[in-house]
Amino acid sequence: MFIGVDHGTQAVRFATLDKRKLELPRENIVESSVVHDMEEGLNLKLEFVKLIGLTYSMGDGITKITNAKKVRNRGIKAVGGAGRYIGGGTAVYDAIHKSDAPAIVLPGIHDESNVDFRMKFFSHGASPEKVGLAYYVSKYHKDRDFILCDVSSNTVSLAVAESRILGAIDAAIFAPGVTQGPLDLQAIRDVDSGLMTANEAFSSGGLLKRSLSEHDMIATLALHAAMEINALQVLLRDYSAQGSIFLGGSAAAKVKVLLDEHLGTSSTVLDQWSAATGCAAIAKDVWGGALDIMGIQVDF
């Protein structure tokens, strides 16, 4: 039995490879009940689980898929950064760590990752659950060259060639999401004037700040996501690849039609369990002896 854990913006999702699923809203998670919730919600006993594929926050403190017992500070450089801290993901991580259940921690994509050197310009590219989502595409859609765009509270895109992650464009860099987005000129002025912190500016930098109609919001999301995807196609061309397009996130189905029109191709929408399932698949393959997952080394 293998479990994957997707530390999402709104909820933490758990999935097994035999399609057991559990979603816990981050605001409702209490560390003392996590193990019970997992066992009851997934109908299993943790003592019989071979390995858990765990994700947490930015994942910028590690570069390898690492045995949880070897990880310090939950695999991050520092607490805080881009996004609102709630504590649910921390409770899940700590509960699993204290339970002594065997677990690996997935890294995020950042400037110390094994990616194209040009994509290391920005300090952070994608959180660890995007690695799980990419592995899901590689494993279950059998695609070796693709671009993954996750459109939800924020928008993050990731490029893969020959089953290796080449780099990612983080939520704070380019396309906005529904609630979060990059800092524009006005946001920088607001931060400099003391009106808000940079994190607050990012956390409120999505399309909701514009009070758009649903039609205009979808149109804007689709356009910016398409531009971000096209930017990563430029990277793939350097590797003689043309990537298939996969969409994740809560807004994926809503933007698909317009996004496909912009790109002149058809994308595939992934469901909300794909990242957790991909993390479980990584756990299974690491358990089976894999030393490299999509260009990321394993230290198990």
Model-derived features: where do they sit?
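Adenine-nucleotide phosphate-binding core of ATP-dependent small-molecule kinases
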Residues: 196-240
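Nucleotide/phosphate-binding catalytic cleft detector across ATP-hydrolyzing
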Residues: 1-4, 58-145, 166, 170-171, ...
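Active-site nucleophile and cofactor-binding loops and adjacent substrate-binding regions
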Residues: 83, 122-131, 149-153, 267-275
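Glycine-rich phosphate-binding loop plus the immediately following alpha-helix
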Residues: 120-145, 162-213
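Glycine-rich phosphate-binding loops at beta-strand->alpha-helix junctions
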Residues: 240-259
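Gly/Thr-rich phosphate-binding beta-strand-loop-beta motif of the actin/hexokinase/Hsp70
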Residues: 1-24, 143-168
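Glycine-rich phosphate-binding/hydrolytic loop that grips phosphoryl groups
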Residues: 257-258, 264-300
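N-terminal phosphate-binding loop and adjacent alpha-helix
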Residues: 20-54, 58-87
